[in-house]
Design a protein with these regions (language model features):
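Catalytic alpha/beta core of large soluble enzyme barrels
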Residues: 1-135
């Protein structure tokens, strides 16, 4: 969080999220710095938009946002499980050890959905996968 970097291949989980300051108890919006820069530069930044996204809503549902922005700023929950697996597989071919990559499912995912992700990972020669089911 300090340097806004990652050693992994995870896509951004959220463009905006809330965090409570332990010193004064205030809740602050943390905004992806690249998204914020584009929002300000192209005139669609607003605190209302940041609060809307921090509540877990998708940028794809917001009217008035340029399509190119919506196409760039896709978050992990919006990516299909198969695409998560294929992203991991693309890296796995060049790495001898296992790769840490979370396969995100929404709350309605079934046991069969998870099984299909595991089978795709096996077919693509991934060394393992991690599954996260929202909610």
């Amino acid at each position: 969080m300090i340097s806004d970097t990652s050693s992994g291949i995870e896509p951004t989980f959220a463009l905006v999220w809330k965090k409570q300051n332990i010193l004064d108890g205030k809740t602050l919006n943390y905004v992806n710095r690249y998204f914020e820069a584009d929002a300000r530069k192209h005139g669609f930044y607003s605190e209302e938009l940041m609060d809307y996204l921090a509540a877990g809503n998708s940028l794809a549902e917001v009217k008035g946002i340029p399509e190119w922005v919506k196409n760039i700023y896709i978050t992990a929950p919006e990516i299909s499980p198969d695409s998560h697996v294929l992203m991991q597989a693309a890296f796995q071919v060049s790495v001898d050890s296992g790769i840490s990559k979370t396969i995100n499912f929404d709350n309605s995912a079934t046991l069969e959905d998870v099984e299909n992700a595991y089978m795709l990972a096996w077919a693509e020669k991934c060394k393992g996968i991690t599954v996260y089911r929202a909610g």
